[in-house]
């Protein structure tokens, strides 16, 4: 059945057809059922965390940890390159726990999952610690070569050797690079020189004057 709808502003009539409400209800039911089936399949496809992969190490300079597994969720804290973490669950994002017991969700691209054996091996191996506020690692022992990644203070990389003014290092995900000795040092040496008195802490704080503050930053 066709009716006419009057449009007074333009002074013309538009034909329209009455809705078949029964047909519309069937379509709504069908698409709702299809949506539940698809989401149910997706839920079944989400892998659980195997017992031998319930550990990991951060593989980017700064890893943002969020309250939920999505980019729009608020940041709770940050984890740094080389930090060992426990993997609590995986739903497309990893829920992780840091050594200081903070928990949060991180994107799967920023964590290198490991077996307990490889995780323990990473923790035992000698590390190079970045001491400068910011810098880069390179493909060759030359600052004019291709960069591998950025690094920030506190980042830890596996020490593979030395070449000239550079340390050869490797990442948790297997990448290898060179970092200048001017911005990093062996972890044992760094720890032996570390001062935690009030004067040293204040001095370090002053070196960050003018750096933007980030809520939940590390």
Model region roles, listed by residue range:
Residues 48-51, 57-87, 130-159, 213:
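Beta-loop motif signature
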Residues 62-63, 185-186, 208-211:
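Acidic/histidine-rich, surface-exposed loop or edge segments in extracytoplasmic proteins
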Residues 92-95, 164-168:
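Short aromatic-glycine-enriched beta-strand elements
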Residues 1-49:
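Bacterial Sec-dependent N-terminal signal peptides
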């Amino acid at each position: 059945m066709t009716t006419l709808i009057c449009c007074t502003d333009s002074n013309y009539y538009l034909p329209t057809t009455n809705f078949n409400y029964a047909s519309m209800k069937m379509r709504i039911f069908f698409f709702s059922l299809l949506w539940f089936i698809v989401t149910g399949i997706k839920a079944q496809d989400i892998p659980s965390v195997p017992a031998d992969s319930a550990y990991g190490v951060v593989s980017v300079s700064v890893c943002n940890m969020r309250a939920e597994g999505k980019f729009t969720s608020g940041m709770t804290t940050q984890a740094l390159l080389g930090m060992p973490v426990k993997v609590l669950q995986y739903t497309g994002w990893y829920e992780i726990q840091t050594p200081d017991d903070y928990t949060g969700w991180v994107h799967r691209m920023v964590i290198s999952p490991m077996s307990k054996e490889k995780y323990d091996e990473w923790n035992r191996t000698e590390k190079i610690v970045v001491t400068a506020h910011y810098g880069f690692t390179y493909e060759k022992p030359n600052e004019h070569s291709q960069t591998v990644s950025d690094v920030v203070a506190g980042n830890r990389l596996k020490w593979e050797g030395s070449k000239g003014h550079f340390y050869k290092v490797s990442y948790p995900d297997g990448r290898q690079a060179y970092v200048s000795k001017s911005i990093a040092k062996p972890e044992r040496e760094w720890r032996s020189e570390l001062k935690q008195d009030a004067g040293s802490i204040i001095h370090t704080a002053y070196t960050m004057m003018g750096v933007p503050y980030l809520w939940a930053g590390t």
